[in-house]
Amino acid sequence: MKIYAFADEANPSVDGQIAAMTRNGLNGLEIRGVDGTNVSEISLEKAQEVRAKMDAAGLETWSIGSPIGKIDIEKDDFQAHMDKFRHTLEVAKILGAKNIRLFSFFIPEGKDAAPYKAEVIRRLKCFVEAAAGTGIDLCHENEKGIYGDIAVRCLEIHQEVPELKAIFDPANYIQCGQDTLEAWTMLKPYVKYMHIKDALTDGSVVPAGKGQGNLPAILKDFQAQGGCQLTIEPHLAVFAGLKELEREGDTSVVGRYVYESNEVAFDAACNALKEIL
């Protein structure tokens, strides 16, 4: 099993992230925060600098933890977002990433998601078309507030856009009231990799195996079907950049467990996964 992480949760600097991955014996990075800047906004020169550091450390950039698709489907400019996606593709090529994580657009609060399905699918197909021939897989993550927040709508996405792979995030399903075993049964044929994040029914994030995510059972089945890549996404402490990941007005529920630093919280998340495996 190859284990990667959102190491920006340990340290905002690339050097600090490399140190955190190295001391925990990880294979590499799902890159998101780069010296305080989101990976989708760094220059190509900066991407080359990061690639050189990762290569020197013997680490791989497995996936781009991009914010693509995390815009309001009604209010925000999709063409500008497509430009950001094309730039993110160029960054991914330089970093040698095999995947780009993306989302299926925020649905206006209080509105039914169903009427937005056709537009969600159209936009996701635009991303697929732009990435064709690059050798980079586009991977949809289930997330609170987007079209693909619950399993049945994620299934629709993968049936309509078969080129998209799935990222299975147990904690995000719990925070949407979705049973994770039901979601896993529906979506496992589409899952390329998992985000290792667990939660309690009140939504608070806890170390892997300590919540209601059914991680031991799902991980066992994932391995049995040939799954061999995981990304640790701790969310056990407030870290630089957390606020930018949330929809305006939302807050992440962290802090059920208390850690003296982000580094300690990151190491705890790594150890929790190793205990399950």
Q: What role is predicted for each listed range?
A:
Residues 1-15, 40-48, 80-85:
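N-terminal-biased segments
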Residues 1-4, 11-25, 51, 151-165, ...:
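Histidine-acidic metal/acid-base catalytic patches
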Residues 2-7, 29-31, 61-66, 100-102, ...:
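Hydrophobic faces of well-ordered beta-strands that scaffold small-molecule active sites
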Residues 9-11, 33-35, 67-70, 104-108, ...:
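Active-site-proximal loop/turn and secondary-structure-junction residues that shape catalytic pockets
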Residues 15-19, 53-56, 73-166, 175-177, ...:
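Active-site acidic/histidine proton-transfer and metal-coordination neighborhood
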Residues 30-54, 104-112:
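Glycine-rich, proline-tolerant flexible connector loops at the mouths of alpha/beta enzymes
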Residues 70-78, 205-209:
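The substrate-binding groove and active-site-proximal loops of carbohydrate-active enzymes
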